[in-house]
Amino acid sequence: MFDDLPTLTHAEQQVAVEKIQKLMAEGISTGEAIKIVAQQIREDKKAQNQGTH
């Protein structure tokens, strides 16, 4: 499930945790919140990588 998840800095990990916690506070399940945030991270990293090439 996380094989294609890019490596994150500690600060990026903290932001991801905060996003997951916010989604969970809104009533989304833990698994779904992780899935949503992981997809956002993948998309952000992909966009960053495309911008550098």
Swiss-Prot record:
Cited InterPro entries: UPF0181 (IPR005371)
The species this protein was found in: Vibrio cholerae serotype O1 (strain ATCC 39315 / El Tor Inaba N16961)
Family: Belongs to the UPF0181 family.
Superkingdom classification of source: Bacteria
Xref: NCBIfam families: PRK05114.1
The protein's name: UPF0181 protein VC_A0569
Pfam family, one: UPF0181
